[in-house]
Amino acid sequence: MPNATLLNMEGKEVGKLALNDAVFGIEPSKSAMHTVVVSYLGNQRQGTQSALTRAEVRGGGIKPWRQKGTGRARQGSTRSPQWTGGGVVFAPKPRSYRTSVNKKIKQLAMRSALSAKLADNEMLFLDNITVETVKTKTIAEMLKNLNVTEKALIVLSENNEQVYLSARNIPGVGVSYVGMVNVYELLKYKKVIMVKDAAEKLGEVYA
């Protein structure tokens, strides 16, 4: 069972955190992570893109000029794809991009993402994050104390409105919590700052 250094908001070590090896110490599956991320991004799409084909564009029923004798290229319609105002070749139509991924692959992808972040030293563990009043400065100073300058995702054990409101104005910083955090978020951000309770919950849920 891997041990991680536990820090406080001042960036000082306050102890060690025992992590579940089945969640934070596996060989990452790139194919599982890829499958889940592609599915997640596809599910975010509205799928409302639409354009008219040559058959659907209004007009263009008459031949613009005779077939031979003009010296110009032969044309049958002013709504052919090469014409301005013409139809679109293989025009996109509204459709659903949703794909489903089975539970086993989703769980493997989450364990893989957590293990990859830990193996690459891109994960920090805090004993707790406390914000008494909504203040961006509190989170900004915490990041400074932790020497985090890259994009960072803060993972809490449960939804905390004060932490979210305090962090939302800092560019490149996201906030999530157990039950909402996903593989795409973990891979999108360079650093993951996770509180102790969240790590323990994830260790139980995905074991």
Can you say where each PLM-predicted feature lies in the sequence?
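Exposed boundary/loop context
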Residues: 4, 8, 18, 40, ...
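Residue-identity detector for glutamine
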Residues: 44-49, 67, 75, 82, ...
